[in-house]
Amino acid sequence: MESQRNILLIGLLFVSFLLWQQWQADKAPQPVAAAQTQSSIPASTVADAHSSDVPDADSAVPEATPASKELITVITDQLEIKIDPVGGDIVYSALLSHKLEEKGDDPFVLLEQTNDIYYIAQSGLIGRDGIDSSVKGRAHFDSASREYKLADGQETLNVPLTYVSDKGVAYTKVFVFTRGKYNIAVDYKINNTSDAQLQVQMYGQIKHSIKKSESSMMMPTYRGGAFSTADTRYEKYSFDDMADKNLDKSTLGGWVAMLQHYFVSAWVPPANDKNIIFSSVSAGGLANIGFRGALYDIAPGTEQSIKAEFYVGPKDQEALSALSPSLNLVVDYGFLWWLAVPIYKLLMFFQSIVGNWGIAIILITLTVRGMLYPLTKAQYTSMAKMRNLQPKLAELKERFGDDRQKMGQAMMELYKKEKVNPMGGCLPILLQMPIFIALYWVLLESVELRHAPFMLWITDLSVQDPYYVMPILMGISMFVMQKMQPMAPTMDPMQVKMMQWMPVIFTVFFLWFPAGLVLYWLVGNLVAITQQKIIYAGLEKKGLK
């Protein structure tokens, strides 16, 4: 009877987890299409507030990308980037190592300007002598070429854009690309050839049309902003949050980002500079999140370099950590992150050995089941002892009738005498569920599993089984486990009905789960069946059935 109740407990915990997830996704109001126009500049500033005029979010989403001949194209081994000479904004990014679709050839596009979405990265210089302004407009840069390409054997590629102000001051905006990397160094070089001191500060912001995440109950995902400060290592700031309240946080270092499933864009200013983190939403439905950096005084006859890093690519934890110690937290494993991180590292270790993510999942399943085996054995031993006590428990029930207090006392004395822990069957279940949930988030959040094949028809472990074969096999394995566990004749009829339907309910739920997660549960069931046979054989020799 205890084994049946444990299966019911698994089901209840599982369904509760799914319902909690859906509640988390739905409790906030839906994104609004527009909000009252507000300046991108927070009320408080790092320095010289009146001169800080970061260009506002556009009042309306532009219709389409300008003609390609007007843009500067940069191609590396990882990225295809398009830069608008007006302001030097990054208006397009294609990730060449990541396909849009598993069987297609088109690369995944992150930044773009289309009729459906407006998503760009903007940076500039503001302040008294800045060349970008919400009033005066943006600087129009010149470039020696309209196309740059990282050559074979070349490790870095510099793309310089130049602008000369009406005062004769030369501003050079240099984009530095590195082989194998998704981060781009944006370096402003200012040569003050005038006879007056200049004051400028750099800003960087990400503009994104408000768009609802393609989330579901089985695969919840987040699309929106996030930021980090010295006090808060990682915090999401959704489109709704931006519409409700503008960010205005002063911090040393920090970063800002726009997140979506598997991919991220982020501005990372210098860690030792004092920056302002800000956000806003325009009347046209554009969400902004960005930073405004330190104010620089540039004496006549001197040069000054002001830089920041921009990342546009997959949520690669190693690459993100190298850019900023907390940027890898955009791979959000939820409240069980402390358990998910070692699971992820172990999964990566197994994959590095076998070269197949599906086999790595099988190995991590065997590892988890092996670690829990002593508890599993204790669980089945406890359940067998409980079954053997059923006749004595029935006698107690007949003796004490409806006197629950005396019945409870007598049962506890019996358990103590027979050295039986009535809760002994629950511990492995309670330990297994957090591991299952943590692995669920690892498989859901880790970009390494996107389009990762297993074998045969499973060509992508991050999405559902296209033919539903594994969920059905998983349901069959649950049915076999159920039949192997003796059902007590005194079991409540309602529990019996629920038990009979549990494999069907789980099968239906798992139809839309990522194939990698279903593989974990299926292999876990097969291991559990094998362990049950071994444990039951040993118990029978001891006279326990």
UniProtKB/Swiss-Prot annotation:
It is a multi-pass membrane protein. InterPro entries: Membr_insert_YidC (IPR019998), Membr_insert_YidC_N (IPR028053), YidC/ALB3/OXA1/COX18 (IPR001708), YidC/Oxa/ALB_C (IPR028055), YidC_ALB_C (IPR047196), YidC_periplasmic_sf (IPR038221). GO terms for molecular function: membrane insertase activity. Keywords: Cell inner membrane, Cell membrane, Chaperone, Membrane, Protein transport, Transmembrane, Transmembrane helix, Transport. Residues 44-65 are annotated as: Disordered. It holds the Pfam family YidC_periplas. The chain crosses the membrane at residues 6-26, 346-366, 424-444, 461-481, 504-524. The keyword Cell inner membrane applies. It comes from the Bacteria. GO terms for biological process: protein insertion into membrane; protein transport. Its main location: membrane. It is found in: Cell inner membrane. GO terms for cellular component: plasma membrane. CDD domains: 5TM_YidC_Alb3 (cd20070), EcYidC-like_peri (cd19961). Interacts with the Sec translocase complex via SecD. Specifically interacts with transmembrane segments of nascent integral membrane proteins during membrane integration. Belongs to the OXA1/ALB3/YidC family. Type 1 subfamily. Required for the insertion and/or proper folding and/or complex formation of integral membrane proteins into the membrane. Involved in integration of membrane proteins that insert both dependently and independently of the Sec translocase complex, as well as at least some lipoproteins. Aids folding of multispanning membrane proteins. This is Membrane protein insertase YidC. It comes from Shewanella pealeana (strain ATCC 700345 / ANG-SQ1).
